[in-house]
Structure formats: C-alpha cells, structure tokens
Amino acid sequence: MFRPDKYPGLDEYYQQKHRAVLVERGEVPPLLRLRGHNPNETLVYDPRYEPYFRRMDLLQFVLNFKGTPPWLNATALTTLTDRWRPETHSFHLPLGEMSITLEDIAMITGLPIEGRALTGKVRAAGWRQRVAALVGVEPEPWTDETRKDPRPSGVLFSWIQRHFHRCPKDASPLVVERFARDYLWNLLTQVVFPDGTGDTASWMFLDPLRDWNVKWSWGSAALAFLYRQVWLNIMHFHFIQWDMMHFHFIKSVVGWST
C-alpha cells in the first residue's frame, strides 16, 4: 500500500505500477530486452547519398551510426531504467538526479535539434502506396484472409534488405535518391525509433523524408520518444517481459558518463 509519509514527493499512480515496487518486495525485476540496431540488417552505405543527407542536416548522424552498432549492456541499461521517475523525468541515482537533454542528443548523436517539430496526422489508409511513391517499390499486401495482418504499421527490415541492400553502380539520380531515402528510413527506425517487434520499420517515419529541404527537429523527436518509451518500461511491472524500444546508445553514453 502506498504511504505518502514514507515516499514524500512520489505520485501514488506511478509508484503503484513502478518496477521499483518489485525491489521493495525483495524481488528481482525481469531483465529488459534490447530492441534496435541489428548489424545483419544494415544496408551498404554509398557516398552518393551524402548530398541528400546533408540537405536534411542528417549527414553527421548517419556517419556516426552507419557502421556496426556498439556493444550494449542490457543489464546496465535495465538498472538505469529502473531509476527513472516520471514525476521529474529524470534518473534518481545515489549521486543525485540525472536527465538526458536536447544538448546531449545533439552533441552525442549529431541529430539536429533546430527546425520544425516532427508532428502530424498519421494516416494508415494507403500507406503501401505512399511507401511505393517514395522508395519505388510497393510492399506486398497481406494475403492470408484467415489471419490479421501481423505488420500493419510498417515493413519488415528483411524486405528493405532484400530490395535496397546496395545501390547499383549505374543507378540513375532518381534511383540513388530512393536508395538514400530508404537507407535513412532503415537507420532511423533501427537506431532512434525502434518498435516492439524488433523487425519492422514504421512507415510513419518515412513520410518526413519526402522533401529533403525540410529541416525537421529529429533530436527533439528522439528525446520525446525516448522519454515515452522509458516511462513504458518502468510502469506495469506485472508483465513478465518487457522490451526496451528507444535510443539505447544515447542512454548508454549518458549512463557511462556518470
């Protein structure tokens, strides 16, 4: 039972569902599983993509993360996540509070924090056709009428790998642009905005890549997404397994710096 006198400053709603309740009971919270950047689903980088990435102020981010992803310690990330408090949006550590800021995002990742807010209406109708218009290939529709489409929110990384693994040497400028867009879509949805499946690129992060001249605040979106996902990780402790679906690298660097 929640006792305000024992935990001054804590919100009863958050505390009753926080993973810290398990620790207080003497139980060990389940290890959170990492979902994100898979080196086996990395596309081949091509310098011909750079003019497009530079126009969107994302070249530095791509150069930082185009290689093999760094090794991540799931246990350390779980421990850090368990110290997140929604009341303050910060990690409460023995040495004090620590939070991840927009400056951290910009300095560590290279994502731009200036520009338009990455918001808008998400329209599911016709998403396959919109994907085809931007990358030149339409994802196959789900044909099994006896089952619900298991991936209505995007395409499999294996599909992207199959169609866009390497840009042809004799590709036209239009084809190079499509491959560049798909490369960036693949990288963003694996590194910054992964989902719970661990194998799907959400189509809603492809729409902002339509116009290379639009300056989006990708860093702000990344930080908001990270905060939301960390909140989901520490709440609802009664689930046996949880997946960490956010920007693992930035949280690892901030954790190491403490």
Predicted segment positions?
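N-terminal leader regions that mediate targeting or early regulatory function
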Residues: 1-230, 234-235, 239, 244
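Intrinsic disorder/low-complexity segments
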Residues: 238, 248-251
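Acidic, Ala/Val/Gly-enriched low-complexity intrinsically disordered segments
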Residues: 243, 253-254
